[in-house]
């Protein structure tokens, strides 16, 4: 599966299911293969759904190099105990101190991110931003494209994208993740989507807490920008 030219993102946990054999749950977990690395971005709300969907995806945790936690809410950290059981000592990148002790106690190795952090030549964790809670995102980039993975966008997705532009001197073309727009008006969704497009975003996969209203708005008004989601879906870029 590790093709250096391909970036593969497998949605393990999401609020909806793309494949009938995958369970849905309010939460997020993405399995990523990119540039000789395989890793998890968030771990869903509980060990059970996380474990069963990983099994359905035929993903062996022994192949995982590290885990990035976007923020320390339960619907993104629920699978950590299962990871600890299978991969004790695995590196877990977190955006603040709030779960450091817990992560150490269950036998994993937490690293608190304070600023833009380069994991490899093409993989970066962004500087954590205040939400609340404090949240970090992940960027995968090469000469052609830049992909931003967002957990819940508590700091605001436009703020996250503008910070990425500041850090990398270019806009992410692709956003995959929770936009935290499930409880805002259609007018607000319109403003945010249009701002993202004006910054330079070309494709949005509005999963997890983005809201049905957001998905429908993008799909109806900007079908070329909309990307589908749901547990069991594979995005290849």
Model-predicted segments: where are they?
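Active-site metal-binding loops of divalent metal-dependent hydrolases
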Residues: 13-16, 43-45, 72, 97-98, ...
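Short, structured coil segments at secondary-structure junctions
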Residues: 57, 88, 106, 200, ...
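Conserved beta-strand hairpin/beta-sheet module of binuclear metal-dependent hydrolase folds
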Residues: 7-56, 135-150, 171
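Short active-site oxyanion
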Residues: 37-39, 65-66, 88-91, 145-147, ...
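Cap/insert and terminal regions of metallo-dependent hydrolase folds
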Residues: 73-79, 146, 153-235
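N-terminal amphipathic/basic leader segments beginning at the initiator methionine
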Residues: 4-12, 118-125
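Active-site metal-binding motif and surrounding structural segment of the metallo-beta-lactamase
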Residues: 48-93, 168-174, 194-197
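Metallo-beta-lactamase
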Residues: 94-137, 142-143, 227-237
């Amino acid at each position: 599966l590790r093709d250096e030219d391909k970036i593969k993102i497998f949605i393990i946990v999401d609020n909806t299911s793309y494949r009938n054999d995958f369970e849905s749950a309010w939460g997020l977990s993405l399995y990523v293969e990119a540039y000789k690395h395989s890793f998890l971005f968030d771990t869903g709300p509980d060990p059970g759904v996380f474990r069963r969907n990983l099994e359905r995806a035929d993903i062996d945790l022994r192949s995982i190099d590290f885990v990035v936690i976007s923020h320390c809410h339960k619907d993104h950290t629920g699978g950590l105990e299962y990871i600890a059981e299978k991969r004790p000592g695995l590196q877990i990148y977190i955006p603040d101190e709030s779960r450091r002790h817990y992560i150490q106690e269950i036998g994993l190795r937490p690293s608190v991110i304070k600023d833009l952090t380069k994991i490899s030549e093409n993989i970066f964790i962004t500087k954590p931003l205040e939400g609340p809670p404090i949240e970090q995102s992940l960027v995968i980039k090469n000469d052609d494209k830049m992909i931003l993975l967002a957990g819940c966008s508590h700091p605001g997705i436009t703020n996250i994208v503008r910070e990425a532009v500041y850090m990398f001197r270019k806009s992410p073309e692709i956003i995959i993740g929770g936009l935290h727009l499930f409880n805002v008006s259609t007018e607000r969704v319109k403003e945010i989507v249009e701002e993202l497009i004006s910054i330079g975003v070309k494709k949005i996969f509005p999963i997890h807490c983005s809201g049905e209203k957001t998905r429908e708005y993008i799909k109806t008004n900007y079908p070329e920008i909309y990307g589908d989601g749901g547990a069991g879906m594979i995005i290849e870029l």
